[in-house]
């Protein structure tokens, strides 16, 4: 059976939960619902935080939570099924299978996680912010104004979906500044208002041009 999920990591974890709840671990395939066309029997999994949390805790106990998450962020074609194969191995053996490099699924997951980690490290080092002269009024962006003036903007073009990975670093580093990091290839942005951060997808926000060189003030 093909299990379709909403394309989020929480949705993927819920799908793993559903597969085991239905005792279909030996016959299941996982695909994002977006773009998945099939004539085979399929089931769409609803995102439920309780189920995702239970699977997340189990992955931590097995010592594979970080690797699974990083590899999932690669968004490589069919990565979900390699991830599920690794999870199955971990559950069957009661420990991490990531040293079993003779298995294709383990090699694929390890390679994907490595690529995401390398790219994350690169953008943590080389992301460049510029100051926007006028703060844009966009939904989801609440700038405190007088107490935290200014808005800093950075555009990145990563090969992998790393906004969630780099968010904690930049929030800690610039905790008293308002900033936006735009992932241009994916049309989404990390928005921080000096209090809270979130990932948003507003076309108007993505279309905001960077300041001209004469207007740039680096952060």
Question: Where are the model-predicted features located?
Answer:
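Extended, charged helical/alpha-beta scaffold domains that provide interaction surfaces
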Residues: 2, 29-34, 47-52, 59-219
């Amino acid at each position: 059976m093909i299990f379709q999920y909403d394309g989020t990591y929480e949705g993927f974890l819920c799908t793993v939960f559903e597969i085991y709840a239905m005792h279909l671990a030996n016959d299941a395939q996982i695909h994002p619902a977006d773009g998945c066309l099939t004539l085979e029997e399929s089931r769409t999994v609803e995102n439920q935080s309780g189920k995702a949390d239970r699977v997340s805790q189990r992955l931590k106990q097995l010592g594979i939570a970080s690797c699974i998450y990083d590899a999932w962020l690669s968004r490589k074609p069919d990565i979900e099924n390699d991830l599920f194969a690794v999870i199955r191995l971990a559950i069957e053996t009661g420990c991490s299978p990531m040293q079993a490099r003779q298995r294709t699924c383990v090699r694929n997951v390890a390679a994907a996680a490595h690529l995401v980690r390398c790219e994350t490290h690169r953008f943590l080092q080389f992301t460049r912010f510029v100051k926007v002269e006028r703060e844009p009024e966009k939904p989801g962006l609440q700038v405190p104004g007088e107490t935290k003036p200014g808005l800093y903007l950075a555009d990145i073009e990563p090969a992998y979906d790393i906004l969630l990975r780099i968010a904690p670093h930049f929030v800690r580093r610039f905790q008293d500044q308002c900033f936006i990091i735009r992932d241009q290839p994916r049309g989404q942005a990390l928005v921080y208002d000096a209090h809270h951060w979130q990932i948003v997808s507003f076309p108007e926000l993505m279309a905001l041009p960077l300041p001209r060189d004469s207007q740039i003030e680096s952060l």
